[in-house]
Amino acid sequence: MIMPPFPTKRMLGIDFFVGTAAEAIAHISKYGGLIVAPAAPSFIALRDDSDYRRAIADADLAIADSGWAVLFWRLLRREKLSRISGLALFKALLETADARIPGNLFFILPSEKAKTKTLEFGRNSGYPTTADDCYVAPRYQKSEVRDPRSDFVGQAFLPAEQTDSGKRECLPYNSNLPSFTSPGIEDPKLVSIIEQRKPKHIIIGIGGGMQDKLGSYLKHQLTYRPGIYCIGAAPGFVTGDQVVIPMWADRFFVGWIFRLLAQPRTLLPRFWSARRLPGMIWRYGRETPSLKVESRS
């Protein structure tokens, strides 16, 4: 199935969806595909991590989750970019009728604690989530086997020239890529489970940039086209596995403060790396940042 074009705005080589969280969910619910939500530190990884670049390039839809990126874009480029946070996207998914259908949602989670919290949330909120709808991800290691198609280009990165309409023309979907593996991740057990259950929506709740790589891997390994949501910690903000972030804090770009206070040792290094973001926006604007460090082949 070919996804029709939709309005986008380009920042750092990524075409971001223009619209509401509900509209993004409706689009992916109808056509399936890989959706990514780069945080501020993830933009830095575009220069440092070629695996991550390929995973982001493989996305069918990208949302501007980073409040810092949206703010700096407005200050430095004098342009408005609509923000859709991963939290808002996840809540919009939960508000759909699809979320109430047994077996439709499948969660990939970072820990047994996250699984327990997800199941408790489902029971308390009336969602038919069972233990079989949850998968605790292993600690993924980078593969030493490199994909020879290092210039693979997918949906979220810009085409060579910007379209006059401001809408992104999507490439035809092709899951018949037996030799393709997503950058740095393989999990045949997970693929087998998903193939058996065939959920319509796959929520990848692991973080650290691994969610996008796993999402790209699943997109090309599965024989059908579900919606794959690479939204990191966002489900945990709702289920209680992570610190609760009020919607007002998310709306005013200060949700990161709540997270930092809850996990300073883990998050401070990642947030500190985001100090490079304003310089990247000033230097590259709409263009894809150059890769600073090439991965080993």
Regions inferred by a protein language model and the residue ranges of each:
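An alpha-beta-alpha
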Residues: A97-S125, W272-E287
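Intrinsic disorder/low-complexity segments
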Residues: M1, A99-R100, R123, P128-T129, ...
